[in-house]
C-alpha cells in the first residue's frame, strides 16, 4: 500500500481546509496504517490549544486532533522553522505530540511518501 502524507499548511478557522483535512485523515486511517502528518507554515496553528472558534462562528474541531493516537496515527511532524517564524517553539504545548523537524529533514520525510494531500 502507498504511504500517504497529510500536510496541514493553512491556519484554522479561516477556511474549512483544516477540518476537511482532519476528517480525511481520520477516514483514511481506517484503510491504512501507513500515514504521515505534517504541520507547516500557518498549519502549525492547527495544534494550539485554547482556541475560541465560536468567536468567528466556526466549529471547534481542534480538540479532535487529540484522537490521532486512538487511530494509531503516530508519525506527526511539525516544521521547526515555521514555529520560529510565528513566535512559537517546540516547548509550546500542542494538542498532539508532533516531532519538530528542520525544513531539509521535513522534505526528506515527505519524499518517502507516495501520495501528498495538502490542506
Curated annotation (Swiss-Prot):
Localization, UniProt: Cytoplasm
Keywords attached to this entry: Cytoplasm, tRNA processing
Extent of the signal sequence: none
Gene Ontology cellular-component annotations: cytoplasm
InterPro entries attached to this UniProt entry: DsrEFH-like (IPR027396), Sulphur_relay_DsrE/F-like (IPR003787), Sulphur_relay_TusC (IPR037450), Sulphur_relay_TusC/DsrF (IPR017462)
Top-level taxon of origin: Bacteria
Protein's GO biological process: tRNA processing
First-listed, main subcellular location of the protein, grouped into a coarse class: cytoplasm
Function according to Swiss-Prot or TrEMBL: Part of a sulfur-relay system required for 2-thiolation of 5-methylaminomethyl-2-thiouridine (mnm(5)s(2)U) at tRNA wobble positions.
Assembly and interaction partners: Heterohexamer, formed by a dimer of trimers. The hexameric TusBCD complex contains 2 copies each of TusB, TusC and TusD. The TusBCD complex interacts with TusE.
Entry similarity comment: Belongs to the DsrF/TusC family.
Protein name per the record: Protein TusC
Amino acid at each position: 500500500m502507498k504511504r500517504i502524507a497529510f500536510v496541514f499548511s493553512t491556519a484554522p478557522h479561516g477556511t474549512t481546509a483544516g477540518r476537511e483535512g482532519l476528517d480525511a485523515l481520520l477516514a483514511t486511517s481506517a484503510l491504512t496504517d501507513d500515514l504521515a502528518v505534517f504541520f507547516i507554515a500557518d498549519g502549525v496553528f492547527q495544534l494550539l490549544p485554547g482556541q475560541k472558534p465560536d468567536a468567528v462562528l466556526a466549529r471547534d474541531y481542534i480538540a479532535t486532533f487529540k484522537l490521532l493516537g486512538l487511530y494509531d496515527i503516530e508519525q506527526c511532524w511539525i516544521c521547526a522553522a515555521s514555529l520560529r517564524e510565528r513566535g512559537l517553539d517546540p516547548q509550546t504545548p500542542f494538542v498532539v505530540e508532533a516531532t519538530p523537524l528542520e525544513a531539509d529533514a521535513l522534505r526528506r520525510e515527505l519524499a518517502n511518501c507516495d501520495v501528498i494531500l495538502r490542506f
